[in-house]
Amino acid sequence: MLEDNERVDHLIKEGYEIIQNDEVFSFSTDALLLGYLTEVRKNDKVMDLCSGNGVIPLLLAAKSTQPIEGIEIQEQLVSMARRSFKLNDLNDRLTMHRMDLKDVYQTFQPAQYTLVTC
């Protein structure tokens, strides 16, 4: 499950694990604050832009049973996020799309989502 230079870190409060790699994006305090301070309502349709390794979808998944989608352009980070979702048995609720933000409107419509993080 882990590739070169990767490690598994723990999101202790949520009881989840996340794959990280110091050679690419690793989450920090700002991502934790965004995840902790974001309120997910019962019927929200959630999208996280520039998702990196999927930390925000993981943090929000601990607050809600709603499906959450993420968008990230870097293939390595998309792979790490998808493997983290699988590691936590969240593949049924969390989806990561590899996509440039310039192309989002070709696939998704803004009205589809009631909560967008970035």
Identify the residue ranges that each predicted region occupies.
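Class I SAM-dependent transferase core
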Residues: 2-41
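Conserved SAM/SAH cofactor-binding pocket of Class I
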Residues: 37-118
